[in-house]
Amino acid sequence: VIVGGVPGDIETALWRSGDVILGSMLALLFCSIYPQRAYTHWRLQMHDSLQQAGRLYHTHLSPNILERPRLAQSHARLLTKIVSLRPLLAPAVKETRLNSTLFEAVQTTMRNTFCTLEMLANTYWRDRQSHFLMQSHPGLRACQQATEAVIIQLALMLKSGDSSAAEAIARLQAAAAEVQAEVRPGADDEATISGYLWLNLQLTEQIAHLHRLLGLVMNPPRSQGNKSS
């Protein structure tokens, strides 16, 4: 490739050698300036997944929709995407030197959260009577809005490191506790929403746990950072 087909053409060979060396140096330079970071890519993909989950949750619970939206395939694609991110965990662990079980816990908690969101949608649209009952309950509506706000804040946390999700989670926990105090499982008019309330409480715990895990991934303890250095 360097010498070419013409014998004795030293000048052309030198020019081609210089081109190869210059191209190699430029490639190394750009690789050092724009590295392929699995950790950053993983965070951005998880951010996109949370945003998509928030949109699905909002669509399912929108008071402007009279019939259940057909989003089963969207939920399935969302769960598939979370599983497809697993190959990024090993290189992300090498880049951050964090414990691999931490990344595994984030993935598992995220998947469980998405499954709970899907179960909430199924319960919300199970039958027309209970649907309108849950839709007209002010406490549940406040809990739903607080859940949407937390999902948005967690997505922002993954993208930019914003730490304001703690306030949104506190509001969600307060809203869930208020609804739990209002609903009496033995009452006939509230029995239909007791299962939905239980799922909301489970979701609140999962979201709070996910927030703690993301805090460790985004801002690891100093002792762990010193060990990695």
Q: Across the structure, where does each feature detected by a protein language model lie?
A:
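A transmembrane helix-and-boundary motif of multi-pass membrane transporters/channels
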Residues: V1-L98, R212, L216-S229
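Amphipathic, non-membrane alpha-helical segments in soluble helical-bundle scaffolds
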Residues: E11-W15, Q36-L50, R68-L79, S100-T113, ...
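Short amphipathic alpha-helical segments and their helix-coil junctions
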Residues: L88-T96, F103, Q107, A177-A187
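Soluble C-terminal extramembrane regulatory/interaction domains of multi-pass membrane proteins
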Residues: T109-S229
